[in-house]
């Protein structure tokens, strides 16, 4: 079950991200007949970023419970560099498709703000910000 999956924190994040992308992006796109691989990759990067930020928030607790995650296995500066790299990758995919518009830039800025300030806010604000980031991405995808 989930208890045994906690020992494999890296795998857990991958599986959670994959299921989230499958349920909230791939299946709806497929059902509507508008499957766009680049958009799917962009969404995957944002979901991965969100999962990694959740890991970072719980890194000390996970380390005490011997749960290995990306956030507690590498230095904080390396972790932040990887998170910023995900946002740059998101922008690069949009640029490659000539779709680097205001919405994409605002999404990336929102992600950068979450990366920058996740450790400084309360647990409640953190939950709202990260889940809000995913909701913001999904809603702007629907209406753009």
Give the predicted meaning of each segment:
Residues 19-31, 45-50, 136-138:
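Hydrophobic cores of alpha-helical transmembrane segments in multi-pass inner/ER membrane proteins
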Residues 43, 47, 87-91, 134-141:
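Helical transmembrane-bundle signal
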Residues 1, 81-129:
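Transmembrane helix-loop-helix
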Residues 24-41, 92-101, 141-144:
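Helix-coil boundary and interhelical linker segments in multi-pass alpha-helical membrane proteins
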Residues 1-20, 67-79, 115-143:
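Interhelical loop and helix-boundary elements at the membrane-water interface
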Residues 47-87:
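Solvent-exposed interhelical
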Residues 1, 22, 42-59, 108-119:
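Transmembrane alpha-helical segments that form the membrane-embedded catalytic/substrate-channel core
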Residues 14, 37-41, 80-81, 105:
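Hydrophobic alpha-helical transmembrane segments
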């Amino acid at each position: 079950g989930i208890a045994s999956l906690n020992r494999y924190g890296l795998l857990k994040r991958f599986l959670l991200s994959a299921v989230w992308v499958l349920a909230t992006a791939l299946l709806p796109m497929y059902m509507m007949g508008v499957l766009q691989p680049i958009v799917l990759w962009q969404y995957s990067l944002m979901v991965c970023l969100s999962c990694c930020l959740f890991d970072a928030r719980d890194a000390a607790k996970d380390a005490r419970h011997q749960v290995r995650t990306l956030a507690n296995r590498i230095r904080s500066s390396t972790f932040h560099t990887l998170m910023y790299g995900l946002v740059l990758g998101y922008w690069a995919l949009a640029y490659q498709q000539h779709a680097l518009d205001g919405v994409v830039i605002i999404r990336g800025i929102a992600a950068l703000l979450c990366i920058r300030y996740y450790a400084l806010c309360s647990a409640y604000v953190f939950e709202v910000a990260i889940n809000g980031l995913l909701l913001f991405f999904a809603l702007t995808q629907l209406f753009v």
